């Protein structure tokens, strides 16, 4: 079934007439992979090599030599892997689950390694948004209301207040730093919409759904290309700049998908599917997501894991056409097979490190936590898809 047919079957007129990605010939692994065991190994490697277990926060390099001063927003994605593991094992391994719950408490006590404030506020809007999303996941996993309260307070006081109307239209500004406040970025608006949607999910306050729609409408009408499904990086001085990145494709998919679930408007689903198709067909080489980083010690090494997180939710949604879901699941599975069998040297466990290029193992230079988080996110996703 083509993507056009899949959407037409939902009674949608405005369809995407693109080619579906077909990874079916790439699904054979060189050996049988136990994804739960693989995820356990990836989680332990992340925690043992990169976490300060007295603080629950993560250091940039495995040997502790890197400067952690600006190591903030990635903390959210690293803790998300711990939450993934917690949710997977809490009913079967109470002792380890309790340890992971303690790490969440410590992470919160130290404000996710926030380098500029005793709370979660930050000059960069997207940095706070990722922290808020992780706090909400911690609340969802544990029921600890303090996490939700901090998430709500941070969003209400320091995120949605950065919505401005200027020559770029609306949109959340990227940063309050001088010279950066004129930039409206996909990286601040995609996660911003997700924050509002998740707060609506757990508070049922209509203002959050209204704000999510507002943020998403700006993003969709400016940086999103409805013909291709690509999401540009930013708009500055009324001019669109920068090409698509897996970070922005992923958060656009996530916010569109959640809006579809909350409203039933199939336009959101169409846009989510288009964005996913663009990633699979135009941002991959031989079926493997492109490496968007020039080095392992780069925030770009986190980007692929962001796409994986939100594409996984889309692939798991049983209300969406089964052929599309299989396509997306197979794409991620192919990436995971190559990453786990070719892109990591497991001979020195737990000193095993993912590379930012999932097709080749790391070298000693690559012992940074950003690619480790993306790799572990991918492997954890396999435990949900299989």
What does each model-identified segment do?
Residues 75, 128-131, 148, 189, ...:
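Residue-level detector of extended alpha-helical repeat arrays and alpha-solenoid scaffolds
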Residues 26-81, 85-126, 161, 184, ...:
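CBM-like carbohydrate-recognition segments
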Residues 97-202, 206-213:
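Extended ligand-binding groove/face enriched in aromatic
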